[in-house]
Protein backbone atom coordinates (compact mmCIF):
# COMPACT_ATOMS: atom_id res chain seq x y z
CA UNK A 1 0.00 0.00 0.00
CA UNK A 2 1.18 3.52 -0.84
CA UNK A 3 0.18 7.01 0.22
CA UNK A 4 0.41 9.66 -2.47
CA UNK A 5 -0.61 13.24 -3.08
CA UNK A 6 -2.32 15.26 -5.73
CA UNK A 7 -0.73 17.38 -8.44
CA UNK A 8 1.17 20.09 -6.53
CA UNK A 9 4.38 20.03 -4.52
CA UNK A 10 4.02 22.42 -1.58
CA UNK A 11 6.98 22.24 0.76
CA UNK A 12 6.79 25.47 2.77
CA UNK A 13 4.17 26.83 5.15
CA UNK A 14 4.03 30.06 3.13
CA UNK A 15 2.45 28.05 0.29
CA UNK A 16 -0.36 26.44 2.25
CA UNK A 17 -2.82 29.33 2.66
CA UNK A 18 -3.93 29.66 -0.95
CA UNK A 19 -2.07 26.73 -2.51
CA UNK A 20 0.21 29.33 -4.08
CA UNK A 21 3.57 27.93 -5.16
CA UNK A 22 6.62 29.99 -4.27
CA UNK A 23 9.61 30.49 -6.56
CA UNK A 24 11.60 27.71 -4.91
CA UNK A 25 9.05 25.03 -5.80
CA UNK A 26 7.90 26.43 -9.14
CA UNK A 27 10.12 24.11 -11.15
CA UNK A 28 8.29 21.12 -9.63
CA UNK A 29 4.80 22.38 -10.49
CA UNK A 30 2.85 22.84 -13.69
CA UNK A 31 1.71 26.00 -15.42
CA UNK A 32 -1.53 26.68 -17.24
CA UNK A 33 -3.41 29.26 -19.25
CA UNK A 34 -7.05 29.71 -20.28
CA UNK A 35 -8.86 29.09 -23.53
CA UNK A 36 -9.98 32.71 -23.38
CA UNK A 37 -6.38 33.96 -23.26
CA UNK A 38 -5.46 31.77 -26.22
CA UNK A 39 -8.44 33.06 -28.22
CA UNK A 40 -7.67 36.69 -27.43
CA UNK A 41 -3.94 36.43 -28.23
CA UNK A 42 -3.82 34.41 -31.46
CA UNK A 43 -0.40 35.80 -32.40
CA UNK A 44 1.12 34.45 -29.17
CA UNK A 45 -1.08 31.40 -28.55
CA UNK A 46 1.03 28.72 -30.21
CA UNK A 47 4.22 29.85 -28.52
CA UNK A 48 2.38 29.86 -25.18
CA UNK A 49 1.34 26.27 -25.85
CA UNK A 50 4.92 25.23 -26.63
CA UNK A 51 6.22 26.96 -23.51
CA UNK A 52 3.62 25.36 -21.25
CA UNK A 53 3.95 21.83 -22.64
CA UNK A 54 7.74 21.94 -22.30
CA UNK A 55 7.59 23.36 -18.78
CA UNK A 56 4.91 20.94 -17.58
CA UNK A 57 6.60 17.78 -18.82
CA UNK A 58 9.91 18.90 -17.32
CA UNK A 59 8.17 19.83 -14.05
CA UNK A 60 6.52 16.38 -13.93
CA UNK A 61 9.91 14.71 -14.31
CA UNK A 62 11.41 16.87 -11.56
CA UNK A 63 8.42 16.22 -9.32
CA UNK A 64 8.78 12.46 -9.78
CA UNK A 65 12.50 12.74 -9.09
CA UNK A 66 11.69 14.55 -5.83
CA UNK A 67 9.00 12.02 -4.85
CA UNK A 68 11.58 9.32 -5.54
CA UNK A 69 13.55 10.53 -2.51
CA UNK A 70 10.65 9.76 -0.16
CA UNK A 71 10.23 6.47 1.72
CA UNK A 72 8.97 3.67 -0.58
CA UNK A 73 5.43 3.73 0.85
CA UNK A 74 5.06 7.40 -0.18
CA UNK A 75 6.35 7.10 -3.73
CA UNK A 76 3.10 7.80 -5.51
CA UNK A 77 1.87 10.99 -7.16
CA UNK A 78 -1.13 12.08 -9.18
CA UNK A 79 -0.18 14.24 -12.15
CA UNK A 80 -2.49 17.11 -13.09
CA UNK A 81 -4.87 16.95 -16.03
CA UNK A 82 -3.85 20.39 -17.29
CA UNK A 83 -0.48 19.25 -18.59
CA UNK A 84 -1.49 20.05 -22.19
CA UNK A 85 -3.85 22.98 -22.60
CA UNK A 86 -7.02 22.37 -24.63
CA UNK A 87 -5.90 18.97 -25.92
CA UNK A 88 -9.51 17.92 -26.60
CA UNK A 89 -10.95 21.40 -27.24
CA UNK A 90 -12.48 21.96 -30.69
CA UNK A 91 -10.23 24.94 -31.42
CA UNK A 92 -7.02 23.07 -30.58
CA UNK A 93 -7.56 19.36 -31.12
CA UNK A 94 -6.22 19.40 -34.70
CA UNK A 95 -3.20 21.46 -33.66
CA UNK A 96 -2.27 18.93 -31.01
CA UNK A 97 -2.62 16.00 -33.44
CA UNK A 98 -0.02 17.31 -35.89
CA UNK A 99 2.71 14.72 -36.35
CA UNK A 100 5.62 16.96 -35.39
CA UNK A 101 3.85 17.90 -32.16
CA UNK A 102 2.92 14.31 -31.35
CA UNK A 103 6.53 13.26 -31.99
CA UNK A 104 7.78 16.06 -29.73
CA UNK A 105 5.37 15.03 -26.97
CA UNK A 106 6.52 11.41 -27.15
CA UNK A 107 10.14 12.52 -26.77
CA UNK A 108 9.17 14.96 -24.02
CA UNK A 109 7.22 12.49 -21.89
CA UNK A 110 9.43 9.42 -22.32
CA UNK A 111 11.96 10.60 -19.68
CA UNK A 112 9.08 11.18 -17.24
CA UNK A 113 8.11 7.51 -17.39
CA UNK A 114 11.72 6.38 -17.32
CA UNK A 115 12.27 8.40 -14.13
CA UNK A 116 9.15 6.92 -12.51
CA UNK A 117 10.18 3.35 -13.27
CA UNK A 118 13.78 3.88 -12.20
CA UNK A 119 12.75 5.34 -8.83
CA UNK A 120 9.72 3.04 -8.40
CA UNK A 121 7.26 5.95 -8.24
CA UNK A 122 3.67 5.03 -9.06
CA UNK A 123 1.81 7.51 -11.29
CA UNK A 124 -1.89 8.27 -11.55
CA UNK A 125 -4.21 10.63 -13.39
CA UNK A 126 -7.77 11.61 -12.51
CA UNK A 127 -9.76 13.18 -15.37
CA UNK A 128 -12.11 15.93 -14.23
CA UNK A 129 -15.74 15.75 -13.22
CA UNK A 130 -16.94 16.19 -16.80
CA UNK A 131 -15.40 12.88 -17.85
CA UNK A 132 -18.53 10.74 -17.41
CA UNK A 133 -18.22 7.49 -19.32
CA UNK A 134 -21.63 6.30 -18.07
CA UNK A 135 -23.59 9.43 -18.95
CA UNK A 136 -27.01 8.94 -20.55
CA UNK A 137 -25.99 11.55 -23.16
CA UNK A 138 -24.26 10.04 -26.20
CA UNK A 139 -22.44 13.34 -26.81
CA UNK A 140 -21.09 13.46 -23.26
CA UNK A 141 -20.00 9.83 -23.52
CA UNK A 142 -18.16 10.60 -26.76
CA UNK A 143 -16.45 13.65 -25.25
CA UNK A 144 -15.61 11.64 -22.13
CA UNK A 145 -13.87 8.96 -24.18
CA UNK A 146 -11.83 11.72 -25.88
CA UNK A 147 -10.90 13.19 -22.51
CA UNK A 148 -9.97 9.81 -21.07
CA UNK A 149 -7.83 8.97 -24.11
CA UNK A 150 -6.01 12.30 -23.69
CA UNK A 151 -4.76 11.05 -20.33
CA UNK A 152 -3.97 7.70 -21.95
CA UNK A 153 -1.83 9.49 -24.55
CA UNK A 154 0.30 11.01 -21.79
CA UNK A 155 0.64 7.64 -20.07
CA UNK A 156 1.47 5.94 -23.38
CA UNK A 157 4.22 8.48 -24.16
CA UNK A 158 5.64 7.69 -20.72
CA UNK A 159 5.74 4.00 -21.64
CA UNK A 160 2.75 2.83 -19.60
CA UNK A 161 -0.36 0.90 -20.62
CA UNK A 162 1.48 -1.97 -22.28
CA UNK A 163 0.16 -4.40 -19.67
CA UNK A 164 -2.46 -4.27 -16.94
CA UNK A 165 -1.73 -1.69 -14.22
CA UNK A 166 1.96 -1.44 -15.13
CA UNK A 167 2.87 1.51 -12.91
CA UNK A 168 0.20 4.03 -13.91
CA UNK A 169 -3.53 4.25 -13.26
CA UNK A 170 -6.20 6.57 -14.69
CA UNK A 171 -9.09 6.85 -12.27
CA UNK A 172 -12.69 7.81 -13.11
CA UNK A 173 -15.90 7.98 -11.09
CA UNK A 174 -18.77 5.74 -12.09
CA UNK A 175 -21.24 8.65 -11.77
CA UNK A 176 -23.66 9.04 -14.69
CA UNK A 177 -27.21 7.72 -14.86
CA UNK A 178 -26.16 4.54 -16.67
CA UNK A 179 -24.14 3.47 -13.64
CA UNK A 180 -21.79 0.46 -13.69
CA UNK A 181 -23.36 -0.90 -16.89
CA UNK A 182 -22.46 2.36 -18.62
CA UNK A 183 -18.81 1.81 -17.73
CA UNK A 184 -18.98 -1.77 -18.99
CA UNK A 185 -20.51 -0.58 -22.27
CA UNK A 186 -17.83 2.11 -22.64
CA UNK A 187 -14.88 -0.27 -22.28
CA UNK A 188 -14.95 -1.58 -25.89
CA UNK A 189 -14.74 2.03 -27.11
CA UNK A 190 -11.46 2.58 -25.26
CA UNK A 191 -8.03 1.79 -26.64
CA UNK A 192 -6.21 -1.33 -25.35
CA UNK A 193 -3.89 0.92 -23.35
CA UNK A 194 -6.89 2.68 -21.79
CA UNK A 195 -8.38 -0.63 -20.68
CA UNK A 196 -5.05 -1.52 -19.08
CA UNK A 197 -4.89 1.78 -17.20
CA UNK A 198 -8.47 2.46 -16.08
CA UNK A 199 -9.52 2.24 -12.44
CA UNK A 200 -13.06 2.87 -11.20
CA UNK A 201 -14.12 4.90 -8.18
CA UNK A 202 -17.58 4.09 -6.87
CA UNK A 203 -19.59 7.20 -5.97
PLM regions and their residue ranges:
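Acidic/histidine-rich catalytic cores of soluble enzymes
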Residues: 174-203
